[in-house]
Curated annotation (Swiss-Prot):
This is Bis(5'-nucleosyl)-tetraphosphatase, symmetrical. Disulfide bonds: none annotated. Keywords: Hydrolase. Signal peptide: none annotated. Pfam families: Metallophos (PF00149). Belongs to the Ap4A hydrolase family. HAMAP family: ApaH (MF_00199). GO terms for molecular function: bis(5'-nucleosyl)-tetraphosphatase (symmetrical) activity. Hydrolyzes diadenosine 5',5'''-P1,P4-tetraphosphate to yield ADP. The keyword Signal does not apply. It catalyses: P(1),P(4)-bis(5'-adenosyl) tetraphosphate + H2O = 2 ADP + 2 H(+).
Length: 270
């Protein structure tokens, strides 16, 4: 049995199939894990959702920011972004089932055997492992509740930018969501920054990648994330794995086989 983890799909379904073919993926024996953002920029977002949802493929995903935005558009809260190719999802007969399935996906997974943490964007530099897991479960419970639309409608803000255990309600939930699905850079005092999307080498000096801040968890724990395509798979820490390599933007899709840490890639199809 092999454990495979793939970076952000963004609708790149054909590339995923070719990547799985490289390793002769066998869902009866192997596991497939994904870093979220199944949808949006590629042409086959619907196919990606259906593939991951189908139990026979033995695939599990976490939620990314584009997945949450899809939920917001399906709810009529937000408009589809000009470059998002999701019309087929809106027209699909199984749209309601896909929507309900998607909102029931986790924000964080800890692998039951290997213990690595799988998250879309990252983990707060202000949390330990217990807090990280508890905050994920708390935010997931809201998404899986009957009033999740009310929270999604208030999701699109950048505050609060720091953590306090005293936060309650939407402020607390929004911080958790932003950490798991949107975060890239932080200030030295661990406040989140949402303005900078530059490669690390081009970022202002006062900003650091979240995983470069002082937190014992970032040294002790294997962490796999996506979201940050401009890293091109380079986190420069032996236990931190960045898997989004911008397939939807013309680069390639990346997959790691966890048992031996071998990397497999598939170039974007023309």
């Amino acid at each position: 049995m092999a454990t495979y983890v793939v970076g952000d799909l963004h609708g790149c379904f054909d590339e995923l199939q070719l990547l799985l073919k490289q390793v002769n993926y066998n869902p009866a024996q192997d596991e497939l894990w994904l870093t979220g953002d199944l949808v949006a920029r590629g042409a086959k977002s619907l196919e990606c959702l259906r593939f991951v949802k189908d139990p026979k493929n033995n695939a599990k995903t976490i939620l990314g920011n584009h997945d949450l935005h899809l939920l917001a558009t399906l709810l009529g809260i937000k408009k589809v972004k000009p470059n998002d190719q999701v019309d087929a999802i809106f027209a699909a007969e199984d749209r309601a089932d896909l929507q309900n399935w998607l909102r029931n996906q986790p924000l964080l997974i800890q692998h039951p055997k290997y213990g690595f943490l799988l998250t879309h964007a990252g983990i707060s530099p202000e949390w330990n492992l217990t807090e990280t897991i508890a905050c994920a479960r708390e935010a997931e419970a809201v998404l899986q509740s009957g009033h999740y639309a009310d929270y999604i409608a208030q999701m699109y803000e950048n505050t609060p930018d720091h953590w306090s255990a005293e936060w309650q309600g939407i402020e607390r939930w929004r911080y958790i969501i932003n950490v798991f699905t949107r975060m890239r850079f932080c200030y030295a005092d661990k406040r989140l920054d949402f303005a900078c999307k530059l490669p690390v080498e081009d970022a202002p000096n006062e900003l650091k990648p979240w995983f470069k801040l002082d937190n014992p968890l970032f040294h002790q724990q294997d962490i796999i994330f996506g979201h940050w395509a401009s890293l091109m798979g380079k986190a420069d820490k032996p236990n931190i794995y960045a898997l989004d390599t911008g397939c939807a933007w013309g680069n390639h899709l990346t997959m790691i086989r966890w048992e031996d840490k071998q990397i497999f890639t598939q170039e974007r199809l023309k």
